[in-house]
A protein has these predicted regions:
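Membrane-interface helix-loop-helix junctions at boundaries between adjacent transmembrane segments
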Residues: 83-137, 150
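Non-cytosolic membrane-interface motifs at loop->transmembrane helix junctions
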Residues: 116-128, 189, 254-264
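Membrane-interface transmembrane-helix boundary segments in multi-pass integral membrane proteins
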Residues: 195, 199, 240, 244, ...
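Alpha-helical transmembrane segments of multi-pass membrane proteins
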Residues: 16-33
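Interfacial helix-start motif at the membrane-water boundary
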Residues: 49-74
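A loop-to-helix transmembrane entry motif
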Residues: 60-68, 186-209
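Alpha-helical transmembrane segments in multipass membrane proteins, preferentially the mid-helix core
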Residues: 78-84, 135-144, 204-222, 276-279
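Alpha-helical transmembrane segments of multi-pass integral membrane proteins
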Residues: 10-21, 103-106, 125-143, 153-178, ...
Length: 286
């Protein structure tokens, strides 16, 4: 398969920028002091008060550091390995590269659009842009691989898993949103922010893509594997992301109920491990 020079240059640019951005976010922890302020909805929000995310809430600031940790420890090493394989013309490398780019696009779209303004705003914009165009070009280059997937793959099981993951995520986000609408109040984790960017990305892009992949596979369209693979990588990397985020949020003083901790982590544990197994099955088939 043909290797895109643009994908390679954009990906190496992302390695450098993400290494810098995630390193600053995780390790620069100058304490400027947290403070309370009244939100647009009349509630009181406490700021994180440390480092790059000092103007974000405790929940979001600590969570962003968790994202930085997983980016440094898992996503960037995976991106480098996938890039090296991609340069050699490896089909598996191309799939892994596209999946890792999808995860980083998801991460930096969230950070660029949802964080309180900070010194790395332009870096986040650059990472969002680079990951978007690199992903589009890499995904377009995957199309010849659709015919390479064999008939012996557990097509129906993978399709059902994609549909289940999409529907479960739909329930997870709609439950607090609809509950808030019924109660006449904003969802709890909106806090002092104007809107919920992660929910926009999940409800508007991730969930429809998962359902589309499942339907395509049920209809025996092998392109469904190409749609599913980036989502599987995102799902696999979200497991350590949610776990590290929760740990740092608890350490920062965020309070959760037991179901709020056990539910997401156990759910992502099950779905994340299944996603890893499906990734392995698809890569082995090439």
């Amino acid at each position: 398969m043909t290797q895109s020079k643009a994908v390679q240059w954009l990906s190496w640019l992302m390695v450098g920028l993400a290494l810098f951005a995630a390193g600053v976010g995780l390790f620069w922890q100058r304490d400027t002091g947290s403070f309370d302020f009244t939100t647009l909805r009349g509630a009181t929000m406490t700021t994180y008060g440390q480092g790059l995310y000092r103007y974000d809430s405790l929940f979001k600031g600590a969570g962003a550091r968790g994202t930085d940790a997983v980016t440094l420890g898992l996503a960037l090493p995976l991106l480098v390995v996938a890039l090296l394989l991609y340069r050699r013309g490896s089909a598996r490398g191309a799939l892994l590269l596209t999946g890792t780019l999808a995860f980083l696009l998801y991460v930096y779209a969230s950070l660029a659009l949802s964080l309180a303004y900070n010194e790395l705003f332009l870096v986040y914009v650059a990472l969002f842009s680079a990951s978007l165009f690199a992903f589009v070009l890499a995904f377009a280059g995957l199309q010849p691989l659709a015919a390479a997937f064999g008939e012996r793959l557990p097509r129906r099981a993978i399709a059902i898993f994609m549909l289940a993951a999409g529907l479960l995520t739909l329930y997870v986000w709609l439950e607090p949103i609809i509950g808030g609408l019924v109660a006449g109040q904003a969802p709890r984790w909106l806090e002092g922010y104007a809107t919920m960017v992660t929910e926009v990305l999940d409800l508007g892009i991730i969930i429809p893509s998962a359902v589309l992949a499942g339907v395509m596979l049920l209809r025996r369209d092998p392109r469904g594997y190409l749609v599913a693979f980036p989502l599987l990588v995102i799902l696999a990397l979200l497991l350590p992301t949610i776990a590290v985020q929760t740990y740092l949020q608890l350490a920062a003083g965020v309070t959760f109920t037991t179901p709020e901790i056990v539910g997401p982590i156990s759910g992502f544990l099950v779905f994340g491990l299944i996603a890893v197994c499906v990734i392995w099955i698809l890569l082995r088939d090439l």
